[in-house]
Amino acid sequence: MVLSALGFALMAALVKVAGLRGFPVLQIIAARALVSLGISWWDTHRKRISPFGQHRKLLFARGLIGFLALMCVYSAVIHLPLAEATILQYTHPIFTLLFALLALKEAANRATLLCIALSILGLVVILQPSTGLQESANLPPYYVFLALLGAAGSGAAYVLVRKLAPLEDSSVIIFYFPLICLPSALVLGWRDFIMPIGCEWLILLGVGVFTQVGQWGLTKGLALYKAGTVVAFSYVQVPLAAMLGLLFFNESLSVTSILGGSLIILGAWINTKDKT
């Protein structure tokens, strides 16, 4: 599970490197999707199942929402400090609950409500500019909004995956994400794409490769350990992101980000712990 967290943290760091080198978000998404599409297609071929599934409208919706969320998340990663962008992504349980309530008629228990309360409190701490502390996050509101929009998209995608899980093979659900992302990114962004030079090819390739490393580690972890243990280990991604931000981008965590991020992660942990 540490491998999974490291994979996702390195993926985010490479997204930031690519963005700072001038690569547009849609080109970074296309590079990731190209790698993921090849691996996902091979996985369905290995299982000897059709990659296109039966419930194509739901599968298409999952892919499209995931694509829109990824645009927001990657934009936030490029323009916000790496640790803060990662912390804001952990607010997705709020949105997962809302969408699950609307789409699946799932009621919230006390642990989930506590998770939401702590997440909102954590957001207030991170975003409050007049805390009286010398070190506040002082994050650009537009990219904070994009990060939260990305978390909302992730929440909606999780609900669709939950709805699709008993209907389709997991490999088919995974396949549709890059299947929608790649053509969407090409159609919307090809005019702005720039030709990579030298090591930039490896940076773009690395985004896709480390995404798969993260996914592989997560899948293996879920197969070997309880879900609560797996998710608890996934929080290692936050200090890893902070360390990578400090080493490669000269970023440091503010006091408000540490306090607010701790509340958000505590809420997510309580929510997960209650379900195991």
Please give the residue ranges for each predicted region.
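Cytoplasmic-side transmembrane-helix entry/capping segments in multi-pass membrane proteins
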Residues: M1-L3, Q54-L64, A108-L121, Y143-V144, ...
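Loop-to-transmembrane-helix transition segments
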Residues: M1-S4, T44-C72, P141-G150, M195-V213
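Transmembrane alpha-helices of multi-pass small-molecule transport proteins
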Residues: R21-L68, G153-A157, Y176-R191
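Juxtamembrane helix-entry segments on the extracytoplasmic side of multipass membrane proteins
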Residues: G22, A30, F52-H55, Q128-A152, ...
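Helix-helix packing/entry segments at the starts of transmembrane helices
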Residues: A85-T91, L164-I180, Q215-L247
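C-terminal transmembrane-helix exit sites in multi-pass transporters
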Residues: P93-A117, P239-I258
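Hydrophobic transmembrane alpha-helices of multi-pass small-molecule transport proteins
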Residues: A111-S130, T256-K275
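Transmembrane alpha-helical segments that form core, pore/gating elements
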Residues: L133-F193
